[in-house]
Amino acid sequence: MAVRTAVIPAAGMGTRFLPATRATPKELLPIYDTPALQFVIDEAAQAGCTRVVIVTSRAKPSIENYASAASTDKVAVSVVYQESPLGLGHAVSCARQAVGDEPFVVMLPDEIMGDASLTKQLVALFEKSGKSSIGLKRVAAAEVSSYGNVKVASGASSTESSVAILQVVEKPKPADAVSDIVIIGRYVLSPKIFDKLEQIKPSANGELQLTDALAMLASENDLVGVVSEITRYDTGTPMGLLRAVIEIALERKDVGPQLNSWLKEKFTK
């Protein structure tokens, strides 16, 4: 079945970015001159999605206003609401009625990818295998505890190839890590995920973790992934956002050369 819908969870309050997020949701903070949310909407369209569903909070009306303006003849953008901040799994479940009985992409807006290639790979992998497909990358051992961690089938972990996922663990302690491969914020999910989300229990902080539902799929041999080296900007922290602004601006023909010259001048004095 073709993948035509993308879900973007955007209900978080962005407390790391205070006081800026008192006025502007973190998803609308600019990466130079383009809101982070727009990068993800554009990526969804480039990956073949014709519909984007943003899961947001009623406390962030500017997200709904932006969604109305972001619709084009190629992609329709709408919103649904997450009434309580109960985690990523809960946010995804809030999109169930909008998604219907179809596969869909989940795209985390605080992870900006260099292009749409990984999402396209995951869509193609899902359409070929029929299994939920997730983006993966290798990290240093000290970083594993910041991510969902996966164990993949032996001998099937080469970069940019599809891998069978055997186990999923949410942010393990370093001693409990099952590999150096972690989940990044791109998922193509079967509608089966909604039933799994209904079965999982809240974590210690009261949230419903998407990784717990993915772990159930993995236990049923129904989860695969792509280990990628795609350029990725983590804009979930102020420093990550600053780095993304600088690196993306440097790549632009209209401002990159001037910015590069200014940086050289600034740091060679």
Go through the PLM ranges and name each one:
Residues 11, 56-57, 109, 137-138, ...:
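Cofactor-binding loop segments of dinucleotide-utilizing enzymes, especially the Rossmann-like FAD-
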Residues 114-196, 200, 204:
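Conserved core of the sugar-phosphate nucleotidyltransferase
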Residues 80-82, 136, 171, 226-229:
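Conserved beta-strand termini and adjacent loop/short-helix elements that scaffold enzyme active sites
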Residues 46, 68, 97-100, 124-131, ...:
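Generic secondary-structure signature for well-ordered alpha-helical cores
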